[in-house]
Amino acid sequence: MNKINTQLENSMNSAIEFLAIALNATGHNSKPVLLHSIRVGFYLYKKGYNQDIVLGGLLHDILEDTETSINDLNDKFGIRVTKIVAANSFNTSIGDKTEQFQDMFNRCKEYGKEALIIKAADIMDNSNYIQFVNDKKTINWLLFKMKSFINISREEIEKEDVWKE
């Protein structure tokens, strides 16, 4: 294994440990956030994306699902990872859930390809759960959310592996 992969894997271990500790201390999402975040990060790693994208994928839910601050995240993982994670996080001051998603998708687009790649991997992983939803209204809302993301991100990431899957 070359030095770059070893460094990346060490950083991934640090991110997973940081996330697990934060979720244990303050996590307030009943979904299996840790496993979801690991799947997203490892998917991006296997696809050969850079360190900022992989770490951003591992940590993409940490700001909205724990009490971790932007400053703590920045101190541990740097400004680029922090900005990618912030772009992928809900603005909780927006009350309407659809508006929260639209705002997040727009911030991902503003940040650029790295944030959009992570959001695509996140949505792809979450889409595996749609089969367990029995409520037609929820299914329609989830499909609307996916279509909205596709529309906003197509131009930026349609040539990326994450888009093709």
Regions found by a protein language model. Name each.
Residues 1-165:
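Active-site helical microenvironments for divalent-metal-assisted chemistry
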